[in-house]
Amino acid sequence: MKIFKPKFWHKKNSLISFFLLPLSIFFQFFLVLKKKLKKRNNFFIPIICVGNIYVGGTGKTPLCIELVNLLRKSNKKIAIIKKFYKAHNDEVKLIESKKIKLFKDSSRVLAIKAAEKDNFDCAILDDGFQDSSIIKNLDIICFNEKQLAGNEMTLPSGPLREPLSSLKNSQIIVINGNVNKIFEKKIKNISNNVSIYYSQYLPTNLNEFANHKLLAFAGIGNPNNFFKLLEDNNLQVVKKISFPDHYNYSKKELDDLINFSIKNNLKIITTEKDFYRIEHCKIPQIKYLSIKLKILNQDKFEKEIIKCLF
């Protein structure tokens, strides 16, 4: 079954959001209570948390990968920590494909302890801003410039796991996309001490798809962001097909994509995450767009990270 994010999550003053408000209040009450009841764990190694408050599609995993690359330049032994969900195996394969040590467990605490035991210098949490059981040295929150905070309401009235006010508990905000001074001002009104950086996705294999008409499909948090990235890089996208985040493709769906592409003389392109989700199917017709995350003002970003940790 395909379940997409509802459109009212990005509409101000939606009646549906208003009617769901009691559930949102209950959800936040439960979240606060859960945080207060959890035992807090300290660790011998510094912990960076790369999280979000907007549910899905903010670029946490690419930022984690880039952080590993930056910290390795300081000759540090870095691991990524991920709470393991079977449905998120695509992200696991993506991280491991970059030759990065990943510790995954149903408990983030146990995964961090395993990294400590193996003498890693630092652990990066891929998600976990809402996990109060871990005392972190640095909280980085990701946003995508195209969605930002939606209607700024919490689940299920809106797309936020926590209200914007929770940003006061973070030190760095990374916005993927174009500069948005209005949103920056909103963040600074919540916490004037938070640092704001921007990032961009840089495709590294565009030549593979240039001069081809493309069928693009994606099962990520925000598929339209992927399609826009293709078009912004002057690729000819003829057909776009969206699937929900971490979607489990059936053989029939993949066969339909291939048959449509053959019939219409199209080359198939997808995201790297989607590719690793269907890698076991061994379909040579499906290729992925390889991307690198670039942090703008990277030197300042890198210095701030290292200052917070070591």
Locate predicted features:
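Phosphate/Mg2+-binding loops and adjacent switch elements
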Residues: K86-S191
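Short, flexible loop segments at boundaries between secondary-structure elements
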Residues: P244-Y247, P284-F310
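G-domain G4 guanine-recognition motif of GTPases
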Residues: I172-K181, S199-P203, F217-N222, P244-Y249, ...
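Walker A (P-loop) phosphate-binding motif
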Residues: V32-K86
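Conserved beta-strand/loop subsegment of P-loop NTPase cores
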Residues: A79-I80, D139-F143, L167-G177, I190-L215, ...
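A transmembrane-helix-recognition feature enriched in membrane-embedded lipid enzymes
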Residues: K2-I47, L309
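Redox- and metal-dependent alpha/beta enzyme cores, enriched for Fe-S-associated oxidoreductases
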Residues: F209-K251
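Residue-level signal for inorganic ion chemistry
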Residues: F26, T61, I95, D126, ...
